[in-house]
């Protein structure tokens, strides 16, 4: 169980009532990815959010986790094909919602 998101909560919020092994594993991966990205943005403990910032960050982290969970089955973004026929897809910041909460805590995250 993460500080800001939990794999089981991700599955509930995604509407997955009877997750497959693959869905459960993906939810665990998403939890680790979001938690790791937030820890990195907080400089691995060098910056500590206030109580109100923690509440906002928890909500934003769940939105980010849901977006990342759904991205696996519904890839989106800009798709380009190179002259050699290779697919190039632009990604998105996995902390889109959380970044606005994290920036006042650690302005150095850019």
Regions found by a protein language model. Name each.
Residues 1-110:
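Divalent metal-cofactor coordination and adjacent catalytic microenvironments
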């Amino acid at each position: 169980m993460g500080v800001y998101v939990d794999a089981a909560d991700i599955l509930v919020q995604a509407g997955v009532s009877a997750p497959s092994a693959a869905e459960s594993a993906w939810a665990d991966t998403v939890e680790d990815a979001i938690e790791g990205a937030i820890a990195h943005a907080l400089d691995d403990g060098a910056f500590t959010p206030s109580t109100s910032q923690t509440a906002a960050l928890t909500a934003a982290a769940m939105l980010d986790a849901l977006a990342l969970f759904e991205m696996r089955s519904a890839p989106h973004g800009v798709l380009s094909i190179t002259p050699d026929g290779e697919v190039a897809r632009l990604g998105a910041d996995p902390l889109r919602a959380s970044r606005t909460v994290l920036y006042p805590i650690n302005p150095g995250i850019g």
